[in-house]
Amino acid sequence: MKKENFLRQFPKEMEYLASKLYNSYEVAKEYEIMGFTEEFYTPNFWKKLGKRMDGLNVICDGVFADSDRRQIAFVPDSFIAGNRDVYDNFAKNGKSLVQDNEKIEDYTDFNNEFNENSFQFPNKLLKISIDSRFREYLHKDFLGSLMGLNIKRELMGDLILENEGRKISGYIPVSEKITDYIISELKQIGKASCEIEIIDTKNKNILPQYKYDDKLITVPSKRLDSIVSTITNLSRTKVIEPIEKGKVLVDYVEEKDKSRMVEIGSLITIRGFGKYKLFLDKGETKKGKERILVKKYI
């Protein structure tokens, strides 16, 4: 795929990130090696790529289940279902990508195991803990302190907060190249001293998970203004202004078209109201309105 055709898929203001993504693809394609991104990409990027791109497998990882921000790998078929020599050459930490001493002809199921266990994306999961007995700490406190180190947001994944007795901990995957810098330089969150440790991510079952409030909404259609109006309990007339001023994002991109039809699985961020996922289509009412299960991130 030519670079100009690739970049055309994404908003102009995201051309820098799109170019870096294309560079990873180009390296993987030209040299028949795996190409990783250092950056974590939002859904407006990885949704467009799908599972394959121009003969390469596209594998994403954001550490957490259902993560929004994900690093992306472009993987040639030879690394998943090639010949015995390729598997043996790619052996990592004493492990070969051969099952039962035989080539893998049908690698559909193997691809999942390959993704999770056979190579490590260039990220580390940090646990940042502070004493929370004397005030409430929010996402913005953790992110503000991290970005205060002049770290770009795209080099960090999703942030999940967990209350742990007298402490609150922020779990966040970061690009491997900035891990040591954060551990060395991040001394506090707000005015609270912090402790930082690297968490082993091999056991996905012990990792923190997102918390949601579920809400079943009924709307005339999946138009953006209709959904935002129902979520916020504001009239459709009143939600037009924040939409047109760029205060509503769909999959992390400002959306100023109030008539846009929003798909199930999309993320809607409404400044001042929070972030929501259109999770499940629950069918229609007797009057023909649409019922949608919406999950609000908490």
Model-derived segments and spans:
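Short, structured beta-strand/loop micro-motifs enriched in basic residues and often containing a Trp
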Residues: K245-V253
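Internal, well-folded beta-alpha domain core
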Residues: V228-S229, S235, K247, I264
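Ferredoxin-like alpha/beta domains used as RNA- or RNAP-binding modules
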Residues: M1-D225, I231, E254, M261, ...
